[in-house]
Every structure is written in C-alpha cells, then in structure tokens.
C-alpha cells in the first residue's frame, strides 16, 4: 500500500461488451486516482484489445495481490485471470466463453473483498444470455453476488446527484407490484432501508415513502393502498423511532428529495424510481447493492453489444460508480 485511499476492485464484465472499454477509459481520469486505488480483475489480452479500440495507451502492471499495485495514473493494476482466447472472442456477440469469463472476474473480486484486499467493488455490464451459454446459472450480478456472499435478499439503492432511491418492488408486473404494497412489506423495507443508510454513514435527515396512486390516493378516492398499507406502516415505523414521512405524491417526492428535504425515497415500484433517477441524469444513475458483507456499486446500463469494439461507449457512468464506491467504502467498514 502506497496510501490510505480505498482499494476498489473492478471486474471488467463481459469481455465481448463495452465493459473493458469503459474501464480503460475510466482509468485515464485523474479524479479516479485522486479518490481511490483502482484494481481491474480481468484478462490482459482483453484489456490491451480494449485500449486499441479506445485509442488509449496505458501500462499494465499484472499483480497477484492488491498490495502489489502501483496505483498511479497511466498504469493499470490488473489481476490477470488469463481466461480468454482472444482469437475466439467475438466482440458484440453472445457467447459462452465471455459469460463464463465474466462470472470468474466477479467471483475473484468477491473473494478478494472477503479477504479484505478490496474495500469495495464497482461492477461493469454482463450479459444474461452469455452467462447461460457459459453454463453460469444466474440471471445477473445481484443474484451472483447474493449467492457468493450468502446474502438472502440484497437491497438495491440508486444514487444520482445526491438523491437516493430504494425500491419496494422491482422485476414484477405493475399489477403484481400493487399487490405487494402491504403494511408488512412497507414496514420491513423502511427498516431495511434505514439500516442500509446507516451502514453507508448516512445518519442525517429522514426518508420519504412515495405514494402509489395519484395524489397518494386522496383519502381513498383514487385507491386505498395508502390508507390500508402505507400510512399504517409509516406510523408504526415512526413509533419505533425511524425517521420517515409519507406517503408523498410521486409527482413531487423526488423533487423534494433532490432539494434536500429527504435523505432518500422509498419508491413503491420499479419504473417509479427508475424514471425519476434516469430522467434527472441517465449516465450518472448508479446502483448500490446493500445488505451484503461487501459494498458494491454498478453502472446501470448493459453490455451495449451494438457499439462494442468501436470505442464509442461513454465512461461517465463507470467513473461515477468507482467514485461512489470510494465515497461510501470508508463509512461502510465501520
């Protein structure tokens, strides 16, 4: 170790997608090295290829352990798993070798984080079809990380420009999401989200719970989920000492959070929170996975096979994910 900055592990994602390109571009940014010590987990051949795509010239320092890193701008510190035949890799295509390799990068990152070599990980895009082709039986990052860390139910938070958004429901139909708005579930998530914020070092302010219906139901005129589930859950949480308010109409709650009235918003369904964050700033919307023994941030875009290999992919989101991991990791450890 040369300094006391947090060490952030960055698995390079699906080697046939834009992941290698956006991490290479990210490591040309001085701000990244000002905030942390980044280490890539991937394949040197893939990284060299990505540098060619992006017209970037950086040195590669292959290491076995984190403390061997140089952590200087102009040099990539790399845990080289050497697991890709570059002649067989087809950029921009679904293929098993890429899915299998991407899984191995994640697995190695988690192992290093568990051993204390990494303070956090910032992940890059993987592809569900490539995972399946590679006989990796997971549907995505969160499921992989949950299994590798023995976490039953990870909690996703989005952060963009200081606004934090949690999700009561995620990948279910809107009809199903409405059915899942129960007093018990809302109360459970208020507690879990509050605990997640505390673990991230966010102790000031209060959480807002978004309304489900127009005008939060208007006392039952436009739906009764607020009266039957949301309000009772909030009142019970308040009695338990949690700082939470609501329901606040979804047309205004995110604006109020952005202005600083609330430290976070509990969104009641997937698109309610996604629309708010991504409209505010699509590229800087970063996912933070809570509830695990390790801290993970992630870009919120896919492998972009259509532009992979062209050097066009923006690294803005990747830089943001790395810096956010560096921001929260010292507090997360406490």
Curated annotation (Swiss-Prot):
Subunit structure as annotated in this protein's UniProt entry: Homodimer.
Functional summary from the UniProt entry: Catalyzes the NAD-dependent oxidation and subsequent decarboxylation of D-threonate 4-phosphate to produce dihydroxyacetone phosphate (DHAP).
Binding site residues for a divalent metal cation: 171, 215, 270
Catalytic reactions on record: 4-O-phospho-D-threonate + NAD(+) = dihydroxyacetone phosphate + CO2 + NADH
Broad class of enzyme this protein falls into: oxidoreductase
Protein's organism: Clostridium botulinum (strain Hall / ATCC 3502 / NCTC 13319 / Type A)
EC code: 1.1.1.408
Keyword terms: Carbohydrate metabolism, Metal-binding, NAD, Oxidoreductase
Names of required cofactors: a divalent metal cation
Species classification: Bacteria, Bacillati, Bacillota, Clostridia, Eubacteriales
Identification of the protein by name: Putative D-threonate 4-phosphate dehydrogenase
Transmembrane segments: none
UniProt binding sites for substrate: 141-142, 278, 296
GO molecular function, one term: NAD binding
Family membership noted in the UniProt record: Belongs to the PdxA family. PdxA2 subfamily.
Pfam families: PdxA
Cofactor note: Binds 1 divalent metal cation per subunit.
């Amino acid at each position: 170790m040369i300094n006391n900055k947090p060490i952030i592990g960055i698995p390079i994602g699906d080697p046939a997608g834009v992941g290698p390109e956006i991490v290479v571009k990210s490591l040309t940014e001085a701000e990244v090295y000002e905030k942390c010590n980044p280490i890539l987990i991937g394949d040197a051949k893939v990284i060299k290829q990505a540098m060619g795509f992006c017209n970037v010239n950086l040195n590669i320092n292959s290491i076995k352990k984190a403390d061997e890193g140089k952590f200087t701008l102009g040099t990539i510190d790399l845990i080289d798993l050497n697991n890709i035949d570059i002649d067989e890799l087809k950029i921009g295509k679904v293929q098993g070798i890429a899915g299998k390799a991407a899984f191995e990068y994640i697995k190695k990152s988690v192992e290093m984080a568990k051993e204390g070599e990494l303070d956090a990980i910032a992940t890059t895009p993987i592809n569900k079809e490539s995972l399946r082709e590679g006989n990796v039986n997971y549907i995505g990052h969160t499921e992989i990380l949950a299994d590798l860390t023995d976490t039953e139910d990870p909690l996703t938070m989005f952060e963009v420009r200081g606004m934090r958004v949690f999700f009561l429901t995620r990948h279910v139909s809107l009809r199903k999401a409405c059915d899942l708005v129960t007093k018990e579930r809302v109360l459970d998530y208020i507690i879990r989200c509050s605990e997640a914020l505390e673990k991230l070092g966010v102790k000031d302010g209060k959480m807002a719970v978004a309304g489900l219906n127009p005008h939060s139901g208007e006392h039952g005129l436009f739906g009764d989920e607020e009266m039957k589930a949301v309000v009772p859950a909030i009142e019970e949480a308040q009695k338990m000492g949690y700082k939470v308010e609501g329901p606040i109409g979804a047309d205004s709650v995110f604006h109020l959070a952005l202005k600083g009235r609330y430290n976070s918003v509990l969104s009641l369904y997937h698109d309610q929170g996604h629309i708010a964050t991504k409209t505010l700033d699509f590229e800087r919307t970063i996912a933070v996975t809570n509830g695990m023994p390790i801290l993970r941030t992630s870009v919120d875009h896919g492998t972009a096979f259509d532009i992979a290999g062209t050097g066009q992919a923006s690294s803005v989101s990747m830089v943001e994910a790395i810096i956010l991991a560096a921001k929260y990791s010292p507090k997360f450890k406490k």
